[in-house]
């Protein structure tokens, strides 16, 4: 999608547009980008937040919503993070 992730500056870039992102958002983008298949909410909770999969939380959904909004507002891209029955992917 022509995005560049600068972890040191905590910036997501596309063309000449920059978006400041948090460490968790970087972790989230990296884990999704490293996978060839969609990742489940439980997998993301365990690997990014170290939460038990028994925990009832909306952490993943909340972070996805916020990151999608930031990317949509800045880059006009509403399909950066996709979700399906199998999980989330880039």
Segments (PLM) and residue ranges:
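Positively charged, aromatic-enriched patches within helix-turn-helix-type DNA-binding elements
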Residues: 16-85
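A structural micro-motif at secondary-structure boundaries
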Residues: 2-27, 89-90
